[in-house]
């Protein structure tokens, strides 16, 4: 008999509905997030865009704007002390930027300004070198005589064999 009592209590525990007489639902419809409760809902903390249907439903806002908050569903008249809470935390993207026409125009204008400043800097730096003579003057200083190339001595076929071998050097002490 004792086993039947345990079996009946287990059967009743599984068959009878367990849980509270009210429920909180977080629903995403189109691009907005809703919090619904079959009794009255109370906003504890966070974002609320608009209340609907006599404090039973509220719109938190667009899902992409990361709505979040703490919401409590109150009990019925029979179970006034029972409450159920839910914490909503949406995190759609961490570093997202909404790309509208103003943002795109700002990026393009900033890119053009940066490119123009870079071109101006290169022009100012490379265009006006001070303290240097022109290339033609450097060539004239390097070539003292009229001859462009010196002939090799003794016409030896070995490459670089006698090139500058016994020439006098200017040694400074």
From Swiss-Prot:
Record localization: Cell membrane
GO biological process: adaptive immune response; cell surface receptor signaling pathway; positive thymic T cell selection
Disulfide bonding pattern of the chain: 37-73
Transmembrane segments: 107-127
Residues bearing the modification Phosphotyrosine: 149, 160
Protein's name in the database: T-cell surface glycoprotein CD3 delta chain
Domain named ITAM: residues: 138-166
PROSITE patterns: ITAM_1
Gene: Cd3d
Post-translational modification note: Phosphorylated on Tyr residues after T-cell receptor triggering by LCK in association with CD4/CD8.
Entry function: Part of the TCR-CD3 complex present on T-lymphocyte cell surface that plays an essential role in adaptive immune response. When antigen presenting cells (APCs) activate T-cell receptor (TCR), TCR-mediated signals are transmitted across the cell membrane by the CD3 chains CD3D, CD3E, CD3G and CD3Z. All CD3 chains contain immunoreceptor tyrosine-based activation motifs (ITAMs) in their cytoplasmic domain. Upon TCR engagement, these motifs become phosphorylated by Src family protein tyrosine kinases LCK and FYN, resulting in the activation of downstream signaling pathways.
Origin organism lineage: Eukaryota, Metazoa, Chordata, Craniata, Vertebrata
Topology of this chain in the membrane: Single-pass type I membrane protein
Stretch forming the signal peptide: 1-21
Known glycosylation sites: 38, 55, 74
């Amino acid at each position: 008999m004792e086993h039947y009592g345990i079996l009946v209590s287990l059967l009743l525990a599984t068959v009878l509905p367990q849980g509270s007489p009210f429920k909180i639902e977080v629903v995403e419809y189109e691009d907005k997030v809703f919090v619904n409760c079959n009794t009255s809902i109370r906003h504890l903390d966070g974002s609320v865009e608009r209340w609907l249907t006599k404090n039973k439903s509220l719109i938190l806002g667009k899902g992409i704007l990361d709505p979040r908050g703490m919401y409590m569903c109150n009990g019925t008249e029979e179970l006034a002390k029972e409450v159920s809470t839910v914490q909503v935390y949406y995190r759609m993207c961490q570093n997202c930027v909404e790309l509208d026409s103003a943002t795109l125009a700002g990026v393009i204008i900033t890119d053009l300004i940066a490119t123009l400043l870079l071109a101006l800097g290169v022009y100012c730096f490379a265009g006006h070198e001070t303290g240097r003579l022109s290339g033609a003057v450097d060539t004239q200083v390097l070539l003292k005589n009229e001859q462009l190339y010196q002939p090799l001595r003794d016409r030896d076929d070995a490459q670089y064999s006698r090139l500058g071998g016994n020439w006098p050097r200017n040694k400074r002490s």
